[in-house]
A protein has these predicted regions:
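Long, charged N-terminal interaction/targeting segments
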Residues: 1-28, 232
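Short, charged surface segments at domain edges that flank catalytic/cofactor-binding sites
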Residues: 20-63, 88-93
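Histidine-centered nuclease catalytic patch
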Residues: 68-101, 109-125
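Extracellular structured ligand-interaction cores
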Residues: 61, 96-98, 140-144
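Short cysteine-rich loop/turn motifs with clustered Cys
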Residues: 50-77, 103-106
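C-terminal, charged low-complexity interaction regions
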Residues: 161-232
C-alpha cells in the first residue's frame, strides 16, 4: 500500500458562512433536519455539496474513501458519501465530519448499512472506535486492511473485515483494476510472477476466482507474445 493510499484526512470540509447559514435555516424548521433536505435547491446548499466534493476529492488524494482506487472526476464523478446513513440519522446530513467521497460502486454496495458501534448515540463520534467501518478522518487504512501484492484486500481487524464485506471490496473487477495499475507502474515480469502467485489464494479474496485466473492468464499470454516480438 502506498502512502498516497494510506491517507487520513486531516480536516473535514469547512463550509462558507453563507453555506452555514443555509444549513441553519434548514435546521431551524419546525421538524428540524430531514434526510430530504439534502436535495434542497437553496443556492448555498448546492454550493456546499459542490465545494465539499471538490475539497474532499483533493484531501483524499483523488481516491475512494473505502477501496482507495483513483476515479477520474472527468469520467465518473465520485459520489458524496454519508458515512452514517442520513435517513437513519438526519441530524448529521450536513455534518462535514460525516461526509467524504466514494466511488459509485462502494457507495452503492455500502448503501444503508449501519456503521455506528452505538446506533442509539445522539453525539457524532470523534474517534474511529465509534465506527464499525473505516472512517477516512479517524482511521489509518493500513491498520485495518492489507493489500496482498497490492491487489487483493485482506481484513486485519474486525473493522477491516466489515469494510471489505459491506463495500464489497472482494469484487473481482477491483482486483483487476489494481493489477492493471501495477502493470503500468512497475516491472512487468516481476508483477506477472506475483499475480500468478496470487491466483493460488484468490478464492479467499475475490468473488469470482475463475474470472481472476483468466484475467491473469491473459496478461501472461500477452506478455509472452510481446517478448517474442521484441526478440525478433
Amino acid at each position: 500500500m502506498t502512502d498516497k493510499e494510506d491517507f487520513i484526512v486531516q480536516e473535514a470540509y469547512q463550509p462558507t458562512e453563507e453555506e452555514k447559514q443555509a444549513i441553519k435555516e434548514l435546521e431551524d424548521k419546525d421538524q428540524g433536519l430531514v434526510a430530504g433536505d439534502w436535495n434542497s435547491q437553496k443556492t448555498y446548499i448546492k454550493s456546499f455539496k459542490k465545494n465539499l466534493r471538490n475539497d474532499m476529492y483533493k484531501k483524499q488524494n483523488k481516491l475512494c474513501a473505502f477501496c482507495r482506487i483513483h476515479v477520474p472526476s472527468a469520467c465518473v464523478p465520485m459520489h458524496r458519501e454519508h458515512i452514517v446513513y442520513k435517513n437513519k440519522h438526519p441530524q448529521w446530513t450536513f455534518l462535514p465530519e460525516n461526509l467524504c467521497v466514494a466511488c459509485p460502486s462502494c457507495n452503492e454496495y455500502k448503501g444503508t448499512t449501519e456503521v455506528l458501534v452505538d446506533p442509539q448515540t445522539s453525539t457524532y463520534p470523534n474517534v474511529g472506535d465509534g465506527f464499525k467501518i473505516i472512517h477516512p478522518l479517524y482511521d489509518r487504512y493500513s491498520d485495518h486492511i492489507e493489500l496482498l501484492g497490492g491487489v487483493l484486500y485482506r481484513g486485519k481487524t474486525d473493522k477491516g473485515v466489515f469494510t471489505i464485506e459491506k463495500c464489497h471490496l472482494h469484487r473481482v473487477g477491483l482486483a483487476e483494476e489494481r493489477a492493471d495499475q501495477k502493470m503500468y507502474m512497475e516491472n512487468k515480469g516481476s508483477i506477472i510472477a506475483e499475480l500468478i502467485l496470487l491466483t493460488t489464494i484468490s478464492n479467499h479474496y475475490v468473488d469470482d476466482q475463475d474470472d481472476f485466473i483468466r484475467y491473469v492468464m491473459d496478461i501472461v499470454e500477452g506478455y509472452k507474445l510481446k517478448q517474442v516480438k521484441d526478440n525478433v
